Design a protein with these regions (language model features):
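Alpha-helical transmembrane segments of compact multi-pass small-molecule transporters, enriched
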Residues: 43-47, 99-113, 191-195, 230, ...
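Hydrophobic/aromatic positions within or immediately flanking transmembrane alpha-helices
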Residues: 11, 29, 34-38, 70, ...
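Alpha-helical transmembrane segments
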Residues: 66-74, 117-131, 180-192
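Hydrophobic/aromatic residues within transmembrane alpha-helices
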Residues: 28, 36, 87, 99, ...
Length: 292
């Protein structure tokens, strides 16, 4: 019973951390997205360093031998997370948060093609509900919704970028069969941060990073902390709960983002709530494996 209580508490913490992460990133919108992504991931990996104190040495060494998966996946993630950070800098957090879950639609396609998973009627229905939910994130009549989606570069960027998030997630599925998930999580964050840092150096965007560290260090640290420890909370949660409970419940972070965006960023979220509900419901149907 104690393990279940701890797991449930960790799950609630994960939902809060995921929801607040987007708010911290939104507050860094004035800086270049590439260098902010670099700082975001490197800071996140820094906050994950304590996990190495509890990882057995033999497990750590085995994980280090298979880091090519993390290198490939983190390189792919750079495209998806750049879209994520860039979209947050240009649009409301309460809009981008549910669109982030569009990666589950891409993941369904990739899982069927490369992992041999069955589609199932519930997953098809979930995909349809998510698709409909996208339109309800925008106000107006159906023709106006189409126009606003087409005109919103940030929305299209996030939907397109979510493909790379799904592709990276597919590689992760193969990788964690042989690599300790904690070592892998740190490696993904660290390598992604290095990739972004390399791009920032090449494009001469580092000055913006120094400016961000000088003026918004607290926000950067909070963003990195929420990024790294949201995953640790997931590991604790699935130690006492089924993954099919922990993963769908994590989608509720969309509503945490919406609440915090309303409270701190003064975003108008009321017209988006129904769309959020539809997208979360559809995403849950995609994630939960129902034997039909």
């Amino acid at each position: 019973m104690d393990l279940i209580i701890i797991a449930v508490f960790a799950l609630f913490l994960r939902i809060f951390l995921l929801g607040s992460e987007r708010i911290f990133l939104k507050q860094l919108e004035e800086y270049d997205s590439v260098i902010i992504s670099a700082v975001f991931f490197l800071t996140g990996s820094f906050f994950l360093l304590p996990i190495f104190l509890v990882i057995p040495q033999e497990t750590l060494l085995t994980g280090l031998e298979d880091l090519q998966f993390a290198l490939i996946s983190s390189f792919i993630y750079t495209f998806g997370f750049f879209a994520y950070v860039k979209a947050l800098s240009e649009e409301d957090a309460s809009l981008i948060a549910p669109l982030y879950n569009a990666s589950l639609l891409w993941l369904l396609v990739l899982s069927v093609l490369f992992l041999g998973e069955d589609v199932g009627i519930f997953r098809v229905f979930g995909a349809f509900i998510m698709f409909i939910g996208v339109f309800f994130l925008y106000p107006g009549k159906i023709t106006e919704k189409f126009h606003k989606i087409r005109e919103s570069k940030a929305s299209l960027l996030m939907i397109g970028g979510s493909f790379f998030l799904a592709l990276g997630r597919t590689i992760d599925t193969f990788a964690i069969r042989t690599i300790d998930s904690r070592v892998y999580a740190f490696s993904i964050l660290f390598f992604a941060g290095l990739f972004f840092l390399g791009i920032a150096i090449f494009t001469k965007k580092c000055n913006d990073g120094f400016l961000a560290l000088k003026n918004d260090l607290k926000t950067i640290l909070c963003a990195g902390f929420t990024n790294g420890w949201a995953y640790i909370m997931l590991l604790i949660a699935i130690a006492g709960l089924e993954v099919t409970v922990a993963e769908p419940a994590s989608l509720l972070s969309v509503f945490v983002t919406a609440f915090l965006a309303k409270l701190f960023l003064k975003e108008e979220i009321e017209e988006r709530l129904f769309g959020m509900v539809l997208m979360v419901l559809g995403a849950i149907l995609l994630v939960i494996k129902i034997p039909i």
